[in-house]
Amino acid sequence: MIEAAFVTPILFLFVFGIFEFGFAFRDYLGVTNTTGDSVREASVAGNVANADYRMLRAAERASAALPDGTIERIVIFRATGPTDTIPSACKTSTSAAVLAANKCNYYTPADFSLDPTEFGCDPASNPVPDPDRHWCPTSRIVSVGAGLDYVGVYMRVTHAYITGLFGSSITFEDSSILKVEPQEI
């Protein structure tokens, strides 16, 4: 009986650790899968006016396994190469000037419900400017002769621990970069 008093707390800690790690790992995989699917869609869409809208639809589909309210931010950004990183200002800023200077568009899960007509790079749209205006999809270089652009997708998710034994939450971030698919020869 005394042995059970010593072993039981350790056993429960072990079981809860497996439980927490499993759910955290599921969210981590959800983030990496979402950035991968989203950047592929953005790459294929190239410089069509609704490229960011198509990327958001891909992100919405790929992130279906993530619990509601965990996605904080999705950013589509211009990269200089396959090993580039997202500009640090794009990770946190909502300032139009900062986003335009860094050529990145940011989105939240609320943007999943946007209508496709709300995209198209119009900074003077009513009642709200188009969300893709900071790095307009129609300005992306898709000609082999001109040197193709690289497009990146970044995502940040906060996973809330269920038991609280390992803290309250952990943040997962991931980004993926691909060369924009050529649209013309």
Where on the chain are the PLM-derived regions?
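N-terminal single-pass transmembrane signal-anchor helix
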Residues: 1-23
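A generic structural signal for ordered alpha-helices
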Residues: 9, 13-16, 33, 37, ...
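Short, conserved structural patches
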Residues: 28, 36-185
